[in-house]
A protein has these predicted regions:
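C-terminal outer-membrane/trafficking sorting elements
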Residues: 419-426, 430-504
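A short acidic/small-residue loop/turn micro-motif
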Residues: 94-99, 287, 382-383, 463-467, ...
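Short active-site loop at a secondary-structure junction
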Residues: 70-77, 99-157, 202-213, 291, ...
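Acidic, glycine-anchored loop motifs typical of Ca2+
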Residues: 131, 271, 429
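Short, surface-exposed loop or secondary-structure junction motifs
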Residues: 92-96, 150-358, 364
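Catalytic loop of the DD-peptidase/beta-lactamase superfamily, centered on the K-T-G motif
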Residues: 21-91, 223-226, 235-236, 278-423
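Bacterial Sec-dependent N-terminal signal peptides
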Residues: 1-27, 414, 428, 504
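Short hydrophobic alpha-helix segments
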Residues: 90-92, 378, 461-462, 498
Length: 504
């Protein structure tokens, strides 16, 4: 068996500064990758089957098939909950390669990573609704002391990552070393809190820092108040009432006969991802170490139903949901706002609420209030988009589905079969100006717009198309460093959405 080394858990460590936080001594970023931060997508693509514009479901299927055809990722699953309550869902790829290759289906479970935090937060907030505790209670009211944990922290500060507590996973190398030596162990929350949390990064409520440790504490609060294990309480308060029959706190709960997709990770540094369960690497240690901060497994269909029920106002009291969505810390450079166990983004100008997460598997699940629509995408492969490895990952699939949904809604939108638009942006990252080259365009003129992470359009220009080719120079020299999205639109619809990073 290959010697495993586990490189990443929930939190994406971002060297580009996109997620930079104000405390320079704690350069650890919220995990969960942003659902709009890795966009480098040309849609639709010739590899896709023809699109029939007769239904939204066909439009989504075309977008999904178009983009996953370009990806080396082993498997994707996706779901969209429509305003009428119907769910579109699709899968592509393999669920395992060893001992034999099997196709991935929409019934396969995958780890949701830090989306688990939203389930835990909602459970605790329902207890607030029931009068069992207050958001402004100090955690020392319910919990025994732990090393490096200030009992003066409030429930509100815990759920919104304003405690400054050290992240036991991403900021303590001893945790990773202990995990590698105990891959088949079942970790307990008290063990993790007692032995693997280092000194705080900053005093209470003076800054913001994403820390998985906060949601170990949230799990223990649930246990102390309910008298049940945290996952029993989540099932009783959230999973069962919402009919989420494909979601489990693994390995504390097991999925029975429901299929669990294998995860793929490069464990020996040869640039080839391995089927971890297929080669015999235990997963119990990793998932139990994540515990109430990230151990749930699920399907995209359960994720979209959860997202719509919670953020659509059907689970929590109005005042509690308002606190969840308005009591947040915000990063103005990225558009991220983190509330009480929930993230808020503005994606292509549209507000959405939810969470994302990574535990080798990668997941996004967000609800769009103005559309009354939810989207979830999961992948069973650790590989992500980066400036040096521009692969199609779950973030890009997620954005492709948003674009397909919005385009379908536009009264003037029409779809063409066998459209082949290829786009190159160079240099990328750019220092101020970049060249945009698109071929395969069929109109005589196109509009190029550049949108920042907050959804604001910073450039909008018309360019001629000569011999089906656009060759344009775009100037962002007056803009701040960050992530931008380039859209190429003709008279009918958006033809290209691609990400460019500006690094001055």
């Amino acid at each position: 068996m290959k010697q495993p080394f586990l490189i990443s858990f929930f939190v994406l460590l971002c060297s580009t500064g996109i997620w930079a936080q104000s405390n320079p001594t704690t350069p650890f970023m919220p995990a969960p990758k942003a659902n709009f931060e890795k966009i480098g997508v040309n849609t639709p693509n010739q590899a896709a089957p023809p699109l029939f514009a007769g239904s939204l479901e066909e439009a989504l299927t075309h977008a999904f098939d178009s983009i996953v055809a370009l990806s080396p990722i082993k498997g994707f699953t996706a779901a969209v909950l429509m305003p009428d309550g119907n769910v579109w869902k699709k899968a592509s790829g393999v669920s395992q390669e060893l001992p034999s290759s099997l196709p991935l289906t929409t019934d396969h479970l995958m780890g949701m990573g830090s989306i688990s935090k939203s389930f835990v937060s909602v459970t605790l907030l329902k207890m607030v609704d029931a009068g069992l505790l207050s958001l402004d209670d100090k955690i020392s009211k319910y919990l025994d002391p732990y090393p490096n944990i200030n009992g003066e922290a409030t429930v509100r500060q815990v759920l919104s990552h304003r405690t400054g507590f050290n992240d036991y996973i991403n900021e303590n190398p001893a945790m990773n070393a202990a995990l590698v030596q105990n891959l088949d162990s079942i970790w307990e929350i008290d063990t993790l809190l007692s032995h693997y949390v280092l000194a705080p990064n900053f005093p209470l409520n003076t800054d913001w820092s994403y820390s998985n440790t906060n949601f170990l504490l949230a799990g223990r609060l649930i246990e102390k108040i309910s008298g049940k294990t945290w996952y029993e309480a989540v099932r009783e308060q959230v999973l069962t009432p919402l009919g989420l029959t494909h979601t489990f706190a693994y390995p504390f709960e097991t999925p029975g006969a429901q299929p669990f997709a294998h995860c793929f990770s490069d464990q020996d540094g040869d640039n080839v991802v391995d089927d971890l369960q297929g080669v015999g690497i235990p997963d119990e240690g990793l998932f139990s170490l994540a515990t109430s901060a990230g151990c749930f497994i699920t399907t995209p269909e359960d994720l979209v139903r959860f997202s719509e029920r919670v953020h659509g106002g059907h689970v929590l009291n109005a005042s509690t949901l308002a606190a969840m969505q308005t009591d947040f810390a915000q990063n103005p450079s990225t558009g991220l706002a983190y509330g009480l166990g929930a993230m808020q983004y503005t994606t292509l100008g549209i507000e959405n609420w939810g969470h994302n997460g990574s535990l080798i598997y990668n997941s996004n699940a967000f609800y769009f209030p103005t559309e009354n629509m939810a989207i979830a995408v999961q992948q069973n492969d650790e590989r992500l988009w980066s400036p040096t490895a521009q692969i199609v990952d779950g973030d890009i699939v997620f954005l492709s589905l948003i674009v397909a949904y919005l385009d379908y809604k536009q009264a003037t939108a029409t779809y063409e079969n066998n459209l082949d638009v290829q786009t190159i942006i160079s240099p990328n990252p750019a220092q101020g100006q970049f060249n945009l080259l698109s071929s395969g365009l069929e109109q005589d003129e196109v509009e190029v717009s550049v949108v920042n992470a907050l959804g604001a359009t910073v450039v909008r220009q018309q360019f001629p198309v000569v011999n089906q080719q656009l060759n344009a120079q775009i100037d962002l020299s007056t803009q701040a460093s960050g992530v931008y999205y380039v859209q190429v639109r003709d008279a009918q619809k958006v033809r290209v959405v691609q990400k460019v990073m500006l690094c001055k």
